[in-house]
From Swiss-Prot:
Cellular component, GO, one term: TIM23 mitochondrial import inner membrane translocase complex
Tagged with keyword Transit peptide: yes
Organism superkingdom: Eukaryota
UniProt record, GO biological process: protein import into mitochondrial matrix
InterPro entries recorded: Tim21, Tim21_IMS_sf
Segments in the Mitochondrial intermembrane topological domain: 93-234
Gene that produces this protein: TIM21
Paired cysteines (S-S): none
Organism, scientific name: Eremothecium gossypii (strain ATCC 10895 / CBS 109.51 / FGSC 9923 / NRRL Y-1056) (Yeast)
Protein name stated in the entry: Mitochondrial import inner membrane translocase subunit TIM21
Keywords of this entry: Membrane, Mitochondrion, Mitochondrion inner membrane, Protein transport, Transit peptide, Translocation, Transmembrane, Transmembrane helix, Transport
Gene3D superfamilies, sorted: Mitochondrial import inner membrane translocase subunit Tim21
Similarity comment: family membership: Belongs to the TIM21 family.
Record Pfam families: TIM21
Length: 234
């Protein structure tokens, strides 16, 4: 017992001894309590203030990087949406526009199917209750189905007056014969649909058949030496 008491007495700290604390390694909240004043980087130890500045720089860089990433992603999304809108507009205008190649082609095929002379030249197998449908396709390089499914050959030009003209060429086929249809259409002043100016069918071994003939142009008569003599006539 005496030995244990002597050991405890030796471990007991003197009454007047002060507790030494390394405030430089204390966290911010404990440093505030120990010094009795609000905590800030001004009063904080140099090491802790430097850490705060590094954290602020890292946070600012993260914000800049996030903003740049968001801006780049937004630009990509807007660009993709713009390209998709243009493609959709071109597809819809091609399929449903009255002046599109698809609509002109469908009208031309219907005109050929409704012409009795053209059906006779193509030797359509028509009965009382049934009429043979024509197969129409673009320029072909073979007899198989895949090479026949090619785009229709068409061009567009402007005349001297600024009116647009459409030129198209495609093939028609029945179970017995084939032919080539060529047409010319021009922009109409009264309708959204171009009006057909010329359309004819060429069947091998047969005379060219005009489904639509162009209106003959009336030549203005000229007088002697190519001049019109006499008073002007309105």
């Amino acid at each position: 017992m005496l030995a244990f008491g002597s050991i405890c007495g030796r471990l007991r700290a003197p009454a007047g001894a002060g507790l030494r604390v390394n405030v430089g390694k204390m966290p911010g909240r404990a440093w505030q309590v120990a010094n009795g004043q609000p905590y800030s980087t001004f009063y904080a130890p140099p090491e802790q203030a430097g850490n705060r500045q590094k954290e602020r720089r890292v946070t600012a860089w993260k914000k800049v990087r996030a903003a740049a990433t968001f801006s780049a992603s937004g630009m990509l999304v807007l660009g993709a949406a713009g390209v998709a809108g243009i493609v959709l507009y071109l597809i819809l205008s091609e399929l449903f526009s009255p002046s599109g190649d698809t609509q002109i082609f469908n009208r031309a095929v219907s005109t050929v199917e409704g012409d009795a002379v053209a059906r006779s030249l193509l030797q359509c197998e028509d009965g009382v209750h049934r009429s043979e449908r024509l197969k129409a396709y673009g320029d072909s390089v073979g007899d198989d189905r895949w090479t026949r499914n090619r785009p229709i050959s068409s061009t567009r030009r402007l005349d001297a007056s600024g009116r647009e003209h459409y030129y198209m060429r495609f093939h028609v086929e029945t179970g017995r014969r084939r032919g080539v249809v060529s047409l010319e259409a021009q922009q109409s002043d009264d309708s959204y649909q171009p009006e057909f100016v010329r359309m004819y069918l060429d069947v091998p071994g047969e005379k060219r058949h005009y489904l639509i003939r162009p209106e003959p142009s009336v030549a203005k008569p000229k007088g002697f030496l190519g001049l019109n003599w006499g008073p002007r006539k309105d």
